[in-house]
Amino acid sequence: MQQQYNPSAIESKVQHFWEENKVFKAVKDITKEKYYCLSMLPYPSGRLHMGHVRNYTIGDVISRYQRMIGKNVLQPMGWDAFGLPAEGAAVKNNTAPAKWTYENIEYMKNQLKVLGFSYDWDREITTCRPEYYKWEQWFFTELYKKGLVYKKTSTVNWCPNDETVLANEQVHEGCCWRCDTPVEQRDIPQWFIKITDYAEELLTQLDNLTQWPDQVKTMQRNWIGRSEGVEITFKIAGSNATLPVYTTRPDTFFGVSYLAVAAAHPLAELASTNNPALAEFIREAKNTKVAEAELATMEKKGMPTGLFAIHPLTGKEIPVWVANFVLMHYGTGAVMAVPAHDERDFDFAKKYGLQINQVIQPLDASTWDFSQAAFTEHGKLINSAEFDGLDFNHAFNAIADKLESLGVGKRQVNFRLRDWGVSRQRYWGAPIPMMTTEQGEVVTVPLKDLPVILPENVVMDGVQSPIKSDPEWAKTTYEGQPALKETDTFDTFMESSWYYARYTCPQYHQGMLDADEANYWLPVDQYIGGIEHATMHLLYFRFFHKLLRDAGILTSDEPATKLLCQGMVLADAFYYTSPTNERIWVSPTQVSLERDEKGRIINATDPAGHKLVHSGMTKMSKSKNNGIDPQEMVEKYGADTVRLFMMFASPAEMTLEWQESGVEGAKRFLGRVWNLVYEYVQQPATQALNALELNKAQKELRRDVHKTIAKVSDDIGRRQTFNTAIAAIMELMNKLNKAPLESDQDKAVMAEALSAVVRMLYPITPHICFELWQALGNQQTIDFAPWVVSDETAMIEDEKLVVVQVNGKVRGKITVPANASEDEVKITAKNDANVAKFLADMQIVKEIYIPFKMLNFVVKV
């Protein structure tokens, strides 16, 4: 063993051993309990960032711990390799997306290996490889045959200059990112998967995910958005047309003062035929693509159509408006507006001078100022004919019954969730396996012709997809007749919705999944990833699992038993303002700092001498130039130090503030562990530990060791509070550093302690522990060593500390044998000099004893 801790030499040697011996290869073994630990697979952008490192370190700590407690662990890694950034990078670097992607994968894979993650690299998946997406294409055709896939027109961003579809990310302030042409909304046919058929199950089975964060489940519940209401049909005055609307508040039905339809609603189109102003308003509204998240804050605009609807119960005419806050693809594309009892309807009515009719009264019969705001809570009905006086529940049912009896309404359960649009008019994605014959028949590509291969050797012009601009690519045959292949590609969420299952059998070629392997390993026992994926990836992930179950391939209902959402990694951000008033962000690695005595930054400058503004700790990002390169940190401090800091600096679910001083502290700690083991192994051979021969100090130290083992086991295994586990090991190390190494039993206790410390640290800092384990004389590598188990008898205390009070004030602390009786404790307390002083000449009226914690003498004053 070298005297000096040299991370780079140790880490490269240990990593070579792991790779050569395939130490982490996972093989199905029905005699062992399996454990599948999975971190969300990365997009191969070119470089790992600290967010990746945190995610994967957490996963690796869990995986290594689970191996040590005897589980058969699968921890794979792969690449979510399709996606729009590759197209942009290909144009910018004059290369093909495939070449750029594969080069990035190679680079990032080496970065992962340098960090020492215990992956089974034989299971590596790259989602842009035909052998992967072949089975995705096949499954899509199976869903189509089951009626779970359909095609319909849907709105996209269209650049009229480039004549191409733009992703939302390519629209900047309403204009094309490339040519600055105003973007239009255009309806084109697109493919959808019926996730709505699974809405109820996706919602109700959230209750079974007891080990998922409540925040994620709440976000999914809100996204699925189940509501119970009534669909009401209004007749349009002077025509045979009708207008269905859905409401969850039929109790407010008598307060409807206008109806609002989406700009794309057929009634709006009809009304605009001879109304140029309305036609222009509709055109403008259609071309302003609004994300649902922006609806609440955007300016509400509308225009009357000139049409009137007949209220089914009062017969009154109600104006129909076109409004920019109504979305065609939600509900019926129309809403009934009750300004007195809905804030949005109220604001719109005030703006355009529409009626505000109160029909709900507060339950306490107090008055409400309807000139200021809507009353949106439940209450009692007024101004509602025979329904006056009813509360919400009774009114809901009574009005629904009446509408149903008249044939103008029906109770309905609605979901906010929409079907999943999987078509993308991009190149770098898996081709959709559908064809259209010369007769216009849409058919699936048969299995024998799969995969439909995406050509990789292409030239990107930055405008059109190469498979769309090449008329030859689409040409094919179906049953001997000419046909055209679909030139859209899949949404990249398709690949990441089932990759976790393919990891169980990546070399299986007879089908999508080997059911035996998949059902042995699945569900995933621990999934790790950011909470930003709560309503997209994590929902599709659950949906796909249910599709695979219903296809008879999988037997479980949910893809992952436990979910951990790691917090973001933050770093200091600094900038100066340029002469053109632009903020120039400077990397924190380039900043010279002065701090006050409390550690606060009082001055910051860059190498050019600019005085910098410190904008605080913010998420590491390219835009603020405050990302820290993991590779630089590994080269400077070692992978184990980076891993240790990542796990110690913050609880896993909380944000982590990157502080290089903390990284330096982690390196110093590992140096102390190394030095203590080095000091120990220089001693002559140790005798076996004999618990009966231990003196008081040795017993106390051994007790601390085993208490630490118990705490660390619970913190890592059950609570997943890795930072507190590390803190406990550090506290123990402080005691071990002060412990003598003189007698045989001193050394024996130290041997047991160091064996425990090295094993407890191994999941977090595996390279140094690999080396220290061998230095301690173990023949088998630590990768196959069992987790250290606490000894209950070692934790039993010979003595207990009891706090002694007189009239509630602490007057002494006594040490008593752990088996002392209550009377013995009281006698010892009364004999304590300080306690005796306060009891002298006093009459004790009561003695309150909490065993081995506290004794209180109540005396007459």
Swiss-Prot record:
Disulfide bonds: none annotated. A motif ('HIGH' region) lies at residues 42-52. It comes from Haemophilus ducreyi (strain 35000HP / ATCC 700724). It catalyses: tRNA(Leu) + L-leucine + ATP = L-leucyl-tRNA(Leu) + AMP + diphosphate. InterPro entries: aa-tRNA-synth_I_CS, aa-tRNA-synth_Ia, Leu-tRNA-ligase, Leu_tRNA-synth_edit, M/V/L/I-tRNA-synth_anticd-bd, Methionyl/Leucyl_tRNA_Synth, Rossmann-like_a/b/a_fold, tRNAsynth_Ia_anticodon-bd. Its main location: cytoplasm. GO terms for cellular component: cytosol. This is Leucine--tRNA ligase. ATP binds at residue 622. Its EC number is 6.1.1.4. A motif ('KMSKS' region) lies at residues 619-623. It is found in: Cytoplasm. One of its GO terms (molecular function) is leucine-tRNA ligase activity. GO terms for biological process: leucyl-tRNA aminoacylation. Belongs to the class-I aminoacyl-tRNA synthetase family. CDD domains: Anticodon_Ia_Leu_BEm, LeuRS_core. Keywords: Aminoacyl-tRNA synthetase, ATP-binding, Cytoplasm, Ligase, Nucleotide-binding, Protein biosynthesis.
